[in-house]
Swiss-Prot record:
GO terms of molecular function: ATP binding; pantoate-beta-alanine ligase activity
Subunit details: Homodimer.
Pathway in which the depicted protein is active: Cofactor biosynthesis; (R)-pantothenate biosynthesis; (R)-pantothenate from (R)-pantoate and beta-alanine: step 1/1
Gene Ontology CC: cytosol
Places the protein is found: Cytoplasm
Function: Catalyzes the condensation of pantoate with beta-alanine in an ATP-dependent reaction via a pantoyl-adenylate intermediate.
Organism, scientific name: Corynebacterium jeikeium (strain K411)
InterPro entries: Pantoate_ligase, Pantoate_ligase_C, Rossmann-like_a/b/a_fold
Identification of the protein by name: Pantothenate synthetase
Amino acid sequence: MTFTPGQAEVFTEIEKIGQLTRAMRKAGRPVALVPTMGALHEGHLSLVQAAQQIPGALVVVSIFVNPLQFAEGEDLDAYPRTLDEDVAKLKAAGVDAVFAPSPREMYPNGPRTTIHPGEAGRILEGAHRPTHFAGVLTVVNKLFTITHCDHAFFGEKDYQQLLLIQQIVTDLNMEVQVHGVPIVREADGLAKSSRNVYLSDEERELALTLSAALTAGAFVAEQGPAAVLQTAGSILDAASGIDVDYLELRGTDLSDTPEDGEARLLVAARVGTTRLIDNVGVPLGTGFKGLDDGGEGSAPADNAGE
């Protein structure tokens, strides 16, 4: 197999990407996987940069709009697909390989076997998108197996997803180390998201209410959980045009709200027809500096599956 590292060579077949990653591991190079659905932005590129910090790693970025994680009526068909532009960005970033399979390649027999998240997948996102995490965990498990990865990188914007992936790595004894990477935001605080392209100028301005509410809630962390929720909730309630699915304060492991210590404030809401999620770390009982100065709170610990 002829292969030139750093050129973002595109692989569409499971067999071919597997041949590459097995050969690299045999040669002593670990495999670092960055799973994405494409429509790449600076948040995704921060995952790439984190993966490139693994000494000697072969960095593989997967681009796959996974139909299994979209319910009927969601935005599967509308989800932006920009493969050529994505590959150009990844080549400029020095990524080694891109795995961009078709749905038929990934699910030749349909979704016969799925992984379900258990109780932790029934709250927050799971309460509003009950089939979502089974689709996510199934495709992530497949990508881990296909690429033989040693490391995998996920953004903290999808905080519940990150914890559930850590959960299956632990529970299924996978030999993969999962790394959480902090949220990347626009200069005005909006969390980077591929779905931001759906927003009109007016909706984008309104979407800033989410990060504003989280920041305001976190700033009163020393006053306790009730003050955090009341403050954040009042900002969301005052904004016309935002339909909130949930605003919840939970432990960093998504357990019930602690009285003090590190917690996570999470929100999901529709702005127009676009559903957005965001979250922030909240140091209950202590001060809060803001999103740009240590304000993401404690990240989930990296999870080694060995």
